[in-house]
Amino acid sequence: LPFIAFCAAAGFAQIIGTNLLLMAFGYRNYVAGTAFAKTEAMQGALLAFLLLGETLSWLTISGIAVGVAGVMIVAAGGQRLRLPDIVQPAALCGLGAGLGFTMTSIFVKSASLELATSDKLLAALVALVVVQGWQTLMQGSYVAVREREQLPRVFSTWRTSGQVGLLAALGSACWFTGFATAPVALVRAVGQVEVILTLGFSRFYLREARKPGEA
């Protein structure tokens, strides 16, 4: 029962975090929301210590802080962030999104620890299947009840959405495996490399111009 509860909580927290991040895009100063969402690694270090008892060396914490600061600067796209920005709706949504993703990490790790197996990879993959199954049920039910007209569109684009879903599932499998085998904050911090990969993909594959703040 605790395993199912942790998986359900992880799925719900991830949905809330994603919705808050999308809400941040709807505000004028959405850049602040995106930047503050990148504080998830620092939030993870604090909450994992309080809830899971995970401890990190001061050197590791300092490295995470520097990494988070760098990612926030890149995410801000050259825009200067000030302390008052933290109370803006976009920033609050960003912080809430970071908290949602952090709690997802903690719930996933807790779920993996509940399984009676020493195979952490197996535990992570079982948790992944349950979490994504629960998310599919929740969101599918919502669409079926509230936005039924969207269902034909979903099925008509199954080829494209299937490819995206497969890549997302593979990414989630890596995330879940990381959470099951290493401290939450470290996994989140290393995962920030996605920003560098995104910039590289944007520059060399999509041929998009680089912004001054990304230099």
List each model region and its residues:
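Hydrophobic transmembrane alpha-helices of multi-pass small-molecule transport proteins
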Residues: 46-52, 59-78, 201, 213-215
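Residue-level recognition of transmembrane alpha-helices
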Residues: 7, 37, 60-64, 128-132, ...
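Residues that define the loop-to-transmembrane-helix transition and helix capping
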Residues: 31, 57, 122-125, 185
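Hydrophobic alpha-helical transmembrane segments in multi-pass integral membrane proteins
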Residues: 44-59, 99-114, 166-184
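Membrane-interface helix-loop-helix junctions at boundaries between adjacent transmembrane segments
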Residues: 21-62
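Short hydrophobic/small-residue motifs within alpha-helical transmembrane segments
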Residues: 11-12, 38-39, 99, 166, ...
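Membrane-interface interhelical linkers
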Residues: 1-12, 18-27, 69, 76-95, ...
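Alpha-helical transmembrane segments of compact multi-pass small-molecule transporters, enriched
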Residues: 36-50, 134, 138, 171-174, ...
